[in-house]
UniProtKB/Swiss-Prot annotation:
<dbReference type="GO" id="GO:1990904">
    <property type="term" value="C:ribonucleoprotein complex"/>
</dbReference>
<keyword id="KW-0687">Ribonucleoprotein</keyword>
<dbReference type="InterPro" id="IPR020594">
    <property type="entry name" value="Ribosomal_bL9_bac/chp"/>
</dbReference>
<dbReference type="InterPro" id="IPR009027">
    <property type="entry name" value="Ribosomal_bL9/RNase_H1_N"/>
</dbReference>
<dbReference type="GO" id="GO:0003735">
    <property type="term" value="F:structural constituent of ribosome"/>
</dbReference>
<feature type="region of interest" description="Disordered">
    <location>
        <begin position="40"/>
        <end position="60"/>
    </location>
</feature>
<dbReference type="GO" id="GO:0006412">
    <property type="term" value="P:translation"/>
</dbReference>
<keyword id="KW-0689">Ribosomal protein</keyword>
<dbReference type="InterPro" id="IPR036791">
    <property type="entry name" value="Ribosomal_bL9_C_sf"/>
</dbReference>
<keyword id="KW-0699">rRNA-binding</keyword>
<dbReference type="GO" id="GO:0005840">
    <property type="term" value="C:ribosome"/>
</dbReference>
<dbReference type="InterPro" id="IPR036935">
    <property type="entry name" value="Ribosomal_bL9_N_sf"/>
</dbReference>
<comment type="similarity">
    <text>Belongs to the bacterial ribosomal protein bL9 family.</text>
</comment>
<dbReference type="Pfam" id="PF03948">
    <property type="entry name" value="Ribosomal_L9_C"/>
</dbReference>
<protein>
    <recommendedName>
        <fullName>Large ribosomal subunit protein bL9</fullName>
    </recommendedName>
</protein>
<dbReference type="GO" id="GO:0019843">
    <property type="term" value="F:rRNA binding"/>
</dbReference>
<dbReference type="Pfam" id="PF01281">
    <property type="entry name" value="Ribosomal_L9_N"/>
</dbReference>
Length: 147
């Protein structure tokens, strides 16, 4: 019996796959647990439409991320901190502070998208990578200056 998998099933198929499985397995396991549905012509058309819509949404998300990258790479964030002797920063500039500054500028970027290996502990300009999409990474200039 041909079925369309609604969820990943170990050893059988992944979400969206259309495969042939034993009738008893399909009826007694896959359909009862709502892991799959029969691959009728109506269900196949609905499945194809769903896949097309998902592909369009993914394409739009990629375009939005690329547009955001172009805007962000033109920006420079200025963070003022307390400093001691020799320009040493008390504390550090974290990804949360950078996310807050971006929010004030009108960008909604989660602090987990900011790929800061170590908090910034020096004065000057630092280039910080932002993971906007699986395929799009922007570079943001963060300037740390004395308060």
């Amino acid at each position: 019996m041909k079925v369309i998998f609604l969820q990943d099933v170990k050893g059988q198929g992944k979400t969206g796959d259309v495969k042939d499985v034993a009738d008893a397995y399909a009826n007694n396991v896959l359909f009862k647990k709502k892991l799959a549905r029969p691959a009728t012509t109506g269900n196949l058309k609905q499945h194809e439409a769903h896949e097309r819509k998902a592909a369009e949404e993914a394409k739009q998300a990629l375009q939005d991320a690329q547009a955001l990258k172009e805007k962000i790479e033109k920006e420079t964030i200025i963070v003022s901190t307390k400093t001691g002797e020799g320009g040493r920063v008390f504390g550090s500039v974290t990804s949360k502070q950078i996310a807050d500054e971006l929010k004030q500028m009108g960008y909604k970027i989660d602090k987990r998208k900011i790929e800061l290996e170590h908090p910034i502990k020096t004065l000057g300009v630092t280039k910080v990578p932002l993971k906007l999409h699986n395929e799009v990474t922007a570079t943001l200039n963060v300037q740390v200056k004395e308060a």
